[in-house]
A protein has these predicted regions:
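Glycine- and acidic-residue-biased ligand/ion/polar-headgroup-sensing regions
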Residues: 119-137
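A short hydrophobic beta-strand segment most commonly corresponding to one strand
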Residues: 100, 122-123, 148-157, 163-180
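Double-stranded beta-helix
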Residues: 8, 14-15, 161-204
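Short acidic-glycine-tyrosine-enriched beta hairpin
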Residues: 137-153
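N-terminal leader/capping segments at the start of a protein or of a new domain
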Residues: 1-76
């Protein structure tokens, strides 16, 4: 059975995350230009309601923030409005075209990897537990808490090898230019996530 077939089967086995909800704190400025706390609160799981009837979420998938241009425009809270528009549109894929996406993802114990590719440069940080990074060639790479992965538009997947403990990772995805290797264009390939997530729309 392939990694993607195992992932599809695992959808039936897991409910929500066992890790505590995280709080997002956003800063800003008051009328005098002094730093203040703009807002705080929990971030909802963006997987809710996206699976077919009878299926359950295989992981928690929270979009903490997005930007939609380089460099980001913070004047008059333009970035906050842009983020809200992205979330409310319901069209966000894994990558936000011309911008960034910051996610917190919780992987249940013993969940196979969903192998996929995005047209993006990604930073992955292990916050809790451990995770195996699955690539097309070579042995899985085991990342421990505090380790980081720089994912450069490759086919890859993440597998929590623990039988009992959840894994939490932070991901920052940045749109990148179209990638070619030896004349072959490598485009987004969502694999088993294609039935759950929308296309990013940045590799046309």
């Amino acid at each position: 059975m392939s990694h993607n077939e195992e992932f599809a089967a695992a959808v039936e086995k897991h409910q929500g995350t066992a890790l505590r909800p995280f709080t997002r704190y956003i800063t800003g400025h008051n009328a005098e230009g002094k730093a203040v706390l703009h807002s705080s609160g929990e971030v909802p799981n963006s997987f809710k309601g996206q699976f077919a009837p009878g299926e359950t979420r295989p992981m928690a998938f929270n979009v903490a923030y997005t930007t939609s241009e380089f460099p980001a425009n913070l004047n008059n809270d333009a970035d906050l409005a842009a983020h809200e528009n992205v979330i409310q549109s319901g069209n966000l894929g894994l990558v936000n075209p011309n911008g960034t996406v910051f996610r917190i993802v919780d992987f249940p114990p013993d969940t196979p990897a969903a192998v996929h590719r995005t047209q993006s440069l990604d930073y992955g940080i292990v916050l809790e537990g451990q995770v195996e990074m699955i690539l097309e060639e070579g042995e899985p790479v085991l990342l421990q808490r505090g380790d980081v992965a720089i994912q450069r538009a490759t086919m890859h997947g993440w597998r929590n090898p623990s039988k009992t403990e959840w894994t939490r990772m932070a991901f920052i995805l940045q749109d990148c230019k179209p990638l070619e290797v030896d004349g072959t264009r490598l485009k987004e390939d969502l694999g088993p996530l294609g039935g759950v997530l929308k296309s990013s729309g940045n590799d046309q």
